Amino acid sequence: MATVIQNPLKALGDQFYREAIEHCRSYNARLCAERSVRMPFLDSQTGVAQNNCYIWMEKRHRGPGMAAGQMYTYPARCWRKKRRLHTPLDPQLRLCELRLEAELMAKREAPQTEATALEALLRGDGILDKRNNNAKEEETLLEIQRVLEADENGDGFHDDEDFEVDTPKRKHRNKGRGRGSGRRRTEAVANDDQDKPYVCDNRYKQKHNSKTADSVCGKRYKNRPGLSYHYAHTHLAEEEGEEERETEIPQSPPVHHENHKPQKAPDGSIIPNDYCDFCLGDSGSNRKTGQAEELVSCSDCGRSGHPSCLQFTDNMMQAVRTYQWQCIECKSCSLCGTSENDDQLLFCDDCDRGYHMYCLKPPMTQPPEGSWSCHLCQNLLKDKASGVEDP
């Protein structure tokens, strides 16, 4: 017959029980803190925008019970609107502008003093007091939310730009395949600025290193993914490299030209760079692997990269030596020669050439699943090709 344990603490032990309770409390505190600082998201099942809530209270917010059976009471918090950071985009102010236009004739006949309050509201003068009150409420809410340690919740508060991720439109391309290189054509500077509206202002180095305005990067890209990849693999890599050089023996880094423009030879050809655009190493040293590796250069913009940094396969490393390779920003269709409709570009997994799906024979409507090889690689590699083209 099983024995009945009168007190479970005797079987578990006081120390074990205290540790279990402490771990449970720590887990609940971390879970509540993580939920309180979570970014708003749209629930795909219910279609409801899940947002932050303020139901998490601390022990110091407890008050005595006000009714029978109540042990504690907590202060009630009224519903409040979000603090509006962009005053010119406030929809309430836009409504005021519409009313102002509708009553334009009446306002012209009315005295000038009647419109002073509305004009002050449109200028943003009357929002200062509201912003100060909201700032005080925000500080109170942040005190409730700070349950984690200072080093753990340091990464919890970011700007909206830190969470902004643009998904590239191009299908079936390998990760990291020359994505940070900017398109460099032989056109005029004005056309280059129009084609590439995304400019790297190097805010990170200005914020932490206090560089002057002359040290702004200024590199231009045609889309945001290219700019983001350049920022992460160039400027952040430079910051990490400076921290490593403080603890190691100083070495002469490869020359990295700011405001890079494609250098041309006397015959008009593009002079390739002598450093990798990803790890900033040269042909004698790959900073990621520490080994010597040959650089692969773009024939249009001159940017270079190590095959391992570009995640090239053995077939790609042999194929790029046989034709004028293009980086992901300069990639064009090998059949029609244009880079339009880049969302329809399909990349070969053996030679890295690009093809429009509608330029293929027969044309494709959807990218194939898995690996895909162009007709050139299928004829050359036969059975060693990565994939077989769908009929």
Swiss-Prot record:
Q: Name one GO cellular component term.
A: nBAF complex
Keyword DNA repair attributed? no
Checking Gene3D superfamilies in the record gives: Zinc/RING finger domain, C3HC4 (zinc finger) (3.30.40.10)
* A GO molecular-function annotation: zinc ion binding
One GO biological process term is: nervous system development
Give the highest taxon in the source lineage.
Eukaryota
Zinc finger (C2H2-type) locations? 198-235
Q: Where is it localised?
A: Nucleus
Q: Which InterPro entries match?
A: DPF1-3_N, Znf_FYVE_PHD, Znf_PHD, Znf_PHD-finger, Znf_RING/FYVE/PHD
Domain note: The PHD-type zinc fingers mediate the binding to acetylated histones.
Q: What does this protein do?
A: Muscle-specific component of the BAF complex, a multiprotein complex involved in transcriptional activation and repression of select genes by chromatin remodeling (alteration of DNA-nucleosome topology). Specifically binds acetylated lysines on histone 3 and 4. In the complex, it acts as a tissue-specific anchor between histone acetylations and methylations and chromatin remodeling. Belongs to the neuron-specific chromatin remodeling complex (nBAF complex) and may play a role in neural development. Plays an essential role in heart and skeletal muscle development.
UniProt cross-references to PANTHER family, sorted A to Z: HL01030P-RELATED, ZINC FINGER PROTEIN DPF3
> What is the name of the protein in this document?
Zinc finger protein DPF3
Q: Taxonomic classification, please?
A: Eukaryota, Metazoa, Chordata, Craniata, Vertebrata
Q: Which gene encodes it?
A: dpf3
